[in-house]
Amino acid sequence: MPQRHHQGHKRTPKQLALIIKRCLPMVLTGSGMLCTTANAEEYYFDPIMLETTKSGMQTTDLSRFSKKYAQLPGTYQVDIWLNKKKVSQKKITFTANAEQLLQPQFTVEQLRELGIKVDEIPALAEKDDDSVINSLEQIIPGTAAEFDFNHQRLNLSIPQIALYRDARGYVSPSRWDDGIPTLFTNYSFTGSDNRYRQGNRSQRQNLNMQNGANFGPWRLRNYSTWTRNDQTSSWNTISSYLQRDIKALKSQLLLGESATSGSIFSSYTFTGVQLASDDNMLPNSQRGFAPTVRGIANSSAIVTIRQNGYVIYQSNVPAGAFEINDLYPSSNSGDLEVTIEESDGTQRRFIQPYSSLPMMQRPGHLKYSATAGRYRADANSDSKEPEFAEATAIYGLNNTFTLYGGLLGSEDYYALGIGIGGTLGALGALSMDINRADTQFDNQHSFHGYQWRTQYIKDIPETNTNIAVSYYRYTNDGYFSFNEANTRNWDYNSRQKSEIQFNISQTIFDGVSLYASGSQQDYWGNNDKNRNISVGVSGQQWGVGYSLNYQYSRYTDQNNDRALSLNLSIPLERWLPRSRVSYQMTSQKDRPTQHEMRLDGSLLDDGRLSYSLEQSLDDDNNHNSSLNASYRSPYGTFSAGYSYGNDSSQYNYGVTGGVVIHPHGVTLSQYLGNAFALIDANGASGVRIQNYPGIATDPFGYAVVPYLTTYQENRLSVDTTQLPDNVDLEQTTQFVVPNRGAMVAARFNANIGYRVLVTVSDRNGKPLPFGALASNDETGQQSIVDEGGILYLSEISSKSQSWTVRWGNQADQQCQFAFSTPDSEPTTSVLQGTAQCH
């Protein structure tokens, strides 16, 4: 009988059924004798317990399974952990060593992917990439490999000297996936039907479409809209472009209609060509700014780095000089405290000054863009559309300074910008830049002017205060941005003279913070000023969120405006799962105070059905009530709602989603992100994907995971608790690394058919020998006979399947039988049956 080791944890019938579903295929098919549950319990056959008292029965030698982790050789889908860090998941072939323990085989190419210095190790450098290495320990001294079969985990320990040092979060470009060819469209359709007390009626529909085609690394995109109201309808193309990544440059090449980044000069739209660096192609730990930390360890030491009291980095370093250049900063400011703990326990500390601004780059990193083409005016404007060229660059000079600048030119316009940003240590971070622009208009009038910009940011960890200030100054009324220079009609009184912006946030204690922000603009030609000031407090206590906000606005062509708002949000989990009730009060100058109550929540097991009920009332007794709901299905998101007030009522409706055409057919999906995945479950329908509400394979076995992170490893896992009864999976997790805009394929080899416990007897009616091996003549599937002559079979359907059973090499030590399920739909997840073997 199977022996079970446990920790006193009682199982419900549902949990036991799940254990059978997970463990029997592994225990009885010859792919292994161990399985695991959520509590990491082990289930395995102890050969000592496998003796039988039934006369005439023979047993098969199963002594190899008496050793922990000793399993049948073969190919397994495993998680690979290198030096205690998970690096990948893939299929690895294992062979048995002299002790009958499994040892992994690697190809030279797989070793490269692990970061091993293949070209610097003579025994590997002379081999082809597809050469097989049976014992890595003999080639790289100090290497150890252990296969934890219970968790399908391969633990590798390889000396650091044999490995390249990659930044944290690094994913080898060899894993970046261009995806498979596809045509797709994203659509968002909304409509409303308004009816008024006077008898009037108005209807409106709107359709947004983002269309695309992928072939290899190339991405063709188009964005179009359609609108319709009671009188007119129109179709507009917003933009179209062709794009691909340039991996060697970590950049994107774009041909067509797009917009500049606005990093140096103001952003504008264009039709042309652009080559720009893409920081998404960098590891997470290399994006943005963080200083390089250098020091010296007297022995093998642990280096710990803290910022604002939090540990943001910890690593072991060998004796000698070390360099750390892959930090994840936790904020824009706050000095780094570096602690070196030597092997004898002694500690040394030093402070690395650190503050940052958005444009700052790491030492040695260059961020750039080069654009050329024709200026693209708005659809309804009367602007010029001259040809132009622009180049910008931002370079991290060292731990302290970042230099940046750019050039922009056309027939009647020229601009030059230069600047520097840097850390001031305990004083914060500061940047200063200047842009000069020369503009000539059609009437031959020429202008030139300067724009000065200063930005300052400072964190005060002792008081949890953050301060950010920006100041813009125009030396005269002759400075024009490229957008303004191409406008044929402009108002002198609207020429901006200066602008100041500030933002201050203050954490009082856990969960409560204050903020204040504001801006002021003044203009040439008049003394008027635009002002906007906001202050507020927000927090959370016992799950209840609250905020109080005040805003003051003053504009030259409008009256002053003041507004006060109070918000409360209370969870209702105790009475209504996944729901909240909220209250909002808004008081605005010259308007009646409004009160609003709202209930939001979601239903079904993964929250794919959401709803909201709202009631509002103001001091003039104007009221409005509304009910809205939306449902996220594998084929799109559907929404509908109804509202009514004193003078009108409204119906609204909508659907958003995607249509994907791929080499295997057409699949409907939820709204697609920049990169997405096609799930192929080998024809199995109803297979759900974890962490993606509403996503499940269609009747053809396909589904689309609508959004992925580009150039980073994405984990796609099947929700095994929701698997259909007639579906088994060879693996439940896949890792994909999509390029920008790619549709990558993730295949889950599903075995479709029911699970059956079959009692098999020989021609004389006696149970088959214990340990006999049964194999499916069509699929190659294998199973082992237990002590009662019972076989566990999967993938069984109403179509008869032929099985061969062997318990020796002689002709009289094998037989055959056929088995199928009844034509009627099974009512249990594990069926039972009998068969006679001839």
Regions found by a protein language model. Name each.
Residues 2-4, 8, 17-29, 37-287, ...:
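Post-signal-peptide, soluble extracytosolic/periplasmic N-terminal scaffold domains
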Residues 72-94, 683-693, 764-778:
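Short, ordered, surface-exposed loop/turn motifs in non-cytosolic proteins
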Residues 91-93, 694-702, 779-790:
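Short, acidic Ser/Thr/Gly-rich low-complexity loop/linker segments typical of extracellular
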Residues 98-106, 327-333, 702-724, 728, ...:
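Short Pro-Gly-centered beta-turn/loop motif in secreted/extracellular proteins
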Residues 162, 191-195, 217, 226-230, ...:
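Transmembrane beta-strands of outer-membrane beta-barrel pores
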Residues 176, 203-216, 236-249, 385-399, ...:
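Feature captures outer-membrane beta-barrel proteins of Gram-negative bacteria and organelles
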Residues 185-189, 222, 253-255, 368-372, ...:
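Membrane-embedded beta-strand positions of outer-membrane beta-barrel proteins
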Residues 295, 677-681, 754-762:
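A short, amphipathic beta-strand motif
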